Regions:
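Active-site pocket scaffolds in enzymes
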Residues: 121-124, 145-148, 157-161, 169-172, ...
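Active-site proximal loops enriched in glycine and acidic residues that flank catalytic Cys/His/Asp
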Residues: 93, 103-107, 124-126, 160-162, ...
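Conserved acetyl-CoA-binding loop-helix of GNAT-fold acetyltransferases
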Residues: 127, 133-150, 168-173
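Acyltransferase donor/substrate-recognition loop-hinge adjacent to the catalytic core
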Residues: 24-72
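Short hydrophobic/aromatic beta-strand or adjacent loop that forms the aromatic wall/cage
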Residues: 35-39, 86, 179-184
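A conserved beta-strand-loop-helix scaffold within acyl/acetyltransferase catalytic domains
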Residues: 73-126
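Conserved active-site alpha-helix within GNAT-family acetyltransferase domains
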Residues: 2-35, 138, 162-180
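Conserved acyl-CoA
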Residues: 1-5, 139-155, 177
């Protein structure tokens, strides 16, 4: 869909810094950057899963579940993901109960010829406030990446707002590397 951006990827990042003509063009027209998003990727062929006691404890108590789509299905979800293959992964207690974290996985098959890799995008990562800073987000992402590698995907992409240190730290702790950044431009009101 159009709203996944001009460059492809798992989310809208704005105009990428790797496109050197974009920023000068928009600034010459009076637009100013208003937000910046970082683009992270992880090569699953080279990925080494971090090991820690906390992650082992989470894996012992929690399980990864896949759900096809949200319930109830909303107009917003349908317009954003309806034409793409997507799946929601939840990390929840093996004994049952509410999920401690969730992320949506979006197939990026449209970019196979350009990127030369079987890629997947991660978006809509959510960890309830009460569950944050306990390793659930990291355990979820690492579990999803392990599953994707088993399904023969070779690259995972995720975006994070610049300035969101928690998201940046989480992605980097899972083996992601920043590969680009994008700026959203807006014309100042007169």
């Amino acid at each position: 869909p159009f709203y996944f951006g001009l460059y492809g990827g798992s989310a809208m990042a704005g105009f990428l810094e790797s496109d050197p003509d974009a920023a000068p063009f928009f600034q010459a027209l009076g637009y100013q950057p208003t937000a910046r998003h970082l683009v992270y990727q992880c090569d699953l062929n080279d990925h080494h899963v971090p090991v820690s006691v906390r992650l082992m404890e989470i894996r012992r108590k929690m399980e990864l579940r896949a759900v096809a789509q949200p319930d109830p299905l909303t107009w917003w979800w349908s317009t954003r993901y309806g034409r793409l293959e997507s799946l929601r992964f939840l990390l929840g207690p093996k004994a049952g109960g509410l999920a401690a974290a969730g992320v949506t996985v979006v197939a990026l098959d449209h970019y196979l010829s350009k990127w030369q890799s079987q890629s997947i995008g991660l978006t809509d990562l959510a960890v309830p406030k009460a569950e944050q800073r306990q390793g659930f987000g990291q355990a979820l992402i690492l579990g999803v990446m392990r599953r994707l590698r088993d399904e023969l995907f070779t690259q995972v992409e995720c975006h994070a707002p610049d300035g969101n240190e928690a998201a940046k730290g989480l992605l980097e702790s899972c083996g992601f590397k920043q590969v680009d950044a994008g700026s959203v431009f807006q014309r100042p009101s007169d």
